[in-house]
Amino acid sequence: MRRLKLAALMLCLSQPVVAAAPPPPGTGIDAAIAAPSRSADNVKLDESRKPAEVLKFFGLRPGMHVIDLFGANRYWAEIIAPAVGPKGHVLVWEPTQFYKPDTKTAFEAFAAKTPNVSIISTPFEAPTLPRNSADFAMLNLDYHDTYWESQKYGIPHMEPAAFLKTLYAAMKPGGIVGVIDHVANPNSDTRATVERLHRIDPEVAKADFKRAGFQLVGESDILRNPADDHNLLVFDPKIRGKTDRFIFKFRKPR
């Protein structure tokens, strides 16, 4: 019996070792962030924006069709386009008020070498997005601007509900909207706070999206900063790039 056991053991040891199957390929987010083709100015923002953690939290995957709102600066598009791959697509929407000639030139050069990227530019007060088209939308540090008006920049008084109605219609059932914005103190006058500080109370943003029909399916503290007391303009050098920011993950019901 002992000889039989020994023979069986030797037979097992003589068999070739089969390597464990490699894990399924990831989203490509890390590789996209490390790509040398990214603009140097955008790479500098990574430390404060933590794009890998953010996009993984939102669930970005290859093949997704993405809307990058206010995205002509290319920060997110440079990462998302390679991450979603050739079967995915990134549609950037940029308000005409912000789509200045230098921004347009830089974006067109980027799009010329990135075949899965395109752009739509319409007035801020009249966003145009293809209906039922997006698996994911990124809204980074700009939702508060739907409460903003500026004679200098040609931005009229707007109703955030109208903006969200357009966004809701653009999302596929089950589509995810990732919202990041600068935190304002609670119970403040939203329009006055946006005008003065370019911040928004997280509960206001949350309520707006819920009224528009979206479901809140996740929150993250990746970009929270307890040292920010929410009283400085977000462009103030003392806090710029270090503001306390909320992250909400909304879904259009299936």
Residue ranges and their predicted role:
Residues 29-57, 61:
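Class I SAM-dependent methyltransferase Rossmann-like catalytic core
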Residues 81-82, 154-173:
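A short glycine-rich, Lys/Arg-flanked "PGG" loop and its adjoining helix->strand segment in the class I
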Residues 189-216:
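Conserved Class I S-adenosyl-L-methionine
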Residues 212, 227-254:
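Core SAM-dependent methyltransferase catalytic element
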Residues 64, 127-141:
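A short acidic, Gly/Pro-enriched loop at the edge of an enzyme's catalytic core
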Residues 63-72:
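Conserved class I S-adenosyl-L-methionine
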Residues 62-63, 86-87, 171-177:
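Short glycine-dipeptide loop
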Residues 102-131:
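S-adenosyl-L-methionine
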